[in-house]
């Protein structure tokens, strides 16, 4: 059977993710598989995610951009994801092609070690913090289904602004000298 954890009212993606990790750790899970509730990700990829964790990876992302082309994803979302992924790849020194995927598997150790500060989303924060703390990250190609319009993120621009703020905050916390140094240098350029 499954253990279902729910909130009486919508607390957002990040809080739901935190509750999920807490419950999984209380249940003594070794590997945690996360998928969004909208049915976008096909569960037949779950064994592949778990297999990669068993091979020694700490965080395995299901990438919608490795392999097949994402024709059903709106252009603005696709463009934003590619841009986020390039920035995250640069910050983490790990090749990331799908930084907003909600389909991932990770170790209990990673769940215990990463403390989330964001109240908005968890996707980029988990990747950055896992990389900065030395956890091994990889991706597997997955298929995804077209889903209805997002109820969480009605405005892609608003999502992008909040996500960029989150990325800058994490970068500032992990690399303060580089972060403030680059800001300072920009004033003297």
Give the ranges of each region predicted by the language model.
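Hydrophobic helical membrane-anchoring modules
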Residues: 93-94, 117-189
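Acceptor/aglycone-binding surface of glycosyltransferases and processive sugar-polymer synthases
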Residues: 7-27, 31-33, 43-120, 145-157, ...
């Amino acid at each position: 059977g499954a253990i279902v954890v729910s909130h009486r009212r919508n607390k957002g993606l990040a809080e739901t993710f935190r509750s999920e990790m807490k419950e999984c750790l209380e249940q003594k899970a070794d590997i945690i598989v996360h998928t969004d509730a909208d049915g976008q990700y096909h569960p037949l990829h779950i064994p592949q995610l778990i297999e990669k964790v068993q091979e020694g990876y700490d965080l395995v992302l299901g990438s919608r951009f490795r392999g097949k082309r994402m024709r059903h994803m709106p252009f603005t979302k696709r463009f934003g994801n590619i841009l986020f992924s390039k920035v995250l790849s640069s910050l983490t020194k790990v090749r990331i092609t799908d930084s907003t995927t909600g389909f991932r598997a990770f170790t209990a150790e990673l769940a215990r070690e990463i403390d989330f500060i964001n109240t908005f989303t968890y996707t980029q924060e988990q990747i950055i913090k896992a990389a900065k703390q030395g956890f091994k990250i990889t991706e597997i190609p997955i298929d995804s289904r077209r889903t209805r319009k997002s109820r969480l993120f009605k405005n892609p621009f608003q999502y992008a602004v909040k996500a960029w703020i989150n990325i800058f905050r994490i970068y500032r916390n992990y690399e303060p000298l580089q972060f403030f140094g680059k800001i300072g240098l920009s004033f003297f350029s």
